């Protein structure tokens, strides 16, 4: 009886419409300069990402490149990245911190981290203090001034140990690496990208999505140390609800076995987000 009444009410009010069709996903294209007024997102395997903003600023996130099995050979030499204006690091694990010290030396770009990693980078002599820019988790910075991209550090459900070999002793050491974070990057044209770094599923993804309204999420799907395909689908479909999603952090080790196909299947055919699956080294313009 209650079901029949609800069906009648839906018919009268039009309140039970079918889900909106998925957003049309941009097609990956060959690397090059982004079109005027657009942003270019270039995924390079695992979490390594280069974003070229509509204003021409180049932001590199989690640059694990030279030993990354998924990075195209052409990008395993750091000069291939070209101009770099800013380096963002989500946390201290080697597959994210990666080549940050070498890239900072090569480009003289500032290194930003919103989770406390910067102090360790300086104290261990990995990055000069003059190049390290610290800001708090949930804080917002505008590195290029008020008309440039705006970057906010948000929560990630993960860990952040910094492991390295001490050159003085030759011994492996583990140091505190701050807290893991993700980044909401609002570009000059208002387009918002959430690079989630490494994270498990957490309920406040809904709140972050409601506050910042990201157009695009770069979301880990590999499983083992991050969300797998099922959890990532819940995050995108039920909590964040972005326009587009690019799966990252998968198939770089036997443990991170999730696939884009599993992610898309878990998301379902009626999900509102368009899923984009570029190959490492393919750019997507927005």
From Swiss-Prot:
Claim: RNA-binding is one of the keywords in the record: no
UniProt xrefs under Gene3D superfamilies: Ribonuclease Z/Hydroxyacylglutathione hydrolase-like
SUPFAM superfamilies reported in the protein's UniProt record: Metallo-hydrolase/oxidoreductase (SSF56281)
Transmembrane portions of the chain: none
Record key words, sorted: Hydrolase
Protein's UniProt keywords contain DNA-binding: no
GO MF annotation, one: hydrolase activity
PANTHER family: UPF0173 METAL-DEPENDENT HYDROLASE MJ1163, UPF0173 METAL-DEPENDENT HYDROLASE MJ1163-RELATED
Family, similarity comment: Belongs to the UPF0173 family.
Listed name of the protein: UPF0173 metal-dependent hydrolase RALTA_A1748
Organism in which the protein naturally occurs: Cupriavidus taiwanensis (strain DSM 17343 / BCRC 17206 / CCUG 44338 / CIP 107171 / LMG 19424 / R1)
């Amino acid at each position: 009886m209650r079901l029949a009444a609800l069906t009648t009410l839906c018919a009268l009010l039009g309140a039970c419409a079918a889900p909106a069709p998925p957003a049309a996903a941009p097609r990956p294209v060959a690397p090059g300069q982004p079109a005027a007024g657009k942003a270019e997102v270039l995924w390079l395997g695992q979490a390594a990402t280069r974003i070229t903003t509509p204003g021409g600023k180049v932001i590199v996130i989690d640059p694990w490149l030279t030993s990354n099995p998924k990075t195209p050979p052409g990008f395993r030499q750091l000069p291939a990245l070209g101009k770099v204006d800013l380096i963002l690091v989500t946390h201290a694990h080697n597959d994210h911190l990666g080549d940050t010290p070498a890239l900072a030396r090569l480009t003289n770009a500032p290194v930003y981290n919103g989770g406390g990693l910067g102090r360790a980078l300086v104290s261990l002599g990995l990055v000069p203090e003059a190049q390290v820019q610290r800001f708090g988790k949930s804080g917002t910075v505008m590195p290029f001034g008020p008309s440039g991209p705006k970057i906010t550090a948000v929560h990630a459900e993960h860990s952040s140990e910094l492991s390295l070999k001490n050159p003085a002793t030759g011994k492996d050491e583990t140091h505190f690496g701050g807290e893991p974070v993700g980044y909401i990057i609002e570009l000059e044209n208002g387009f918002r990208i959430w690079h989630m770094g490494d994270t498990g599923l957490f309920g406040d993804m809904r709140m972050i999505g409601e506050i910042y309204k990201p157009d695009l999420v770069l979301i880990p799907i590999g499983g083992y140390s991050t969300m797998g395909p099922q959890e990532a689908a819940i995050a995108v479909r039920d909590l964040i609800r972005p326009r587009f999603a690019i799966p990252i952090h998968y198939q770089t080790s036997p443990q991170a076995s999730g696939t884009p196909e599993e992610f898309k299947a878990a998301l379902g055919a009626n999900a509102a987000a368009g899923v984009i699956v570029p190959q490492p080294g393919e750019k997507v313009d927005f």
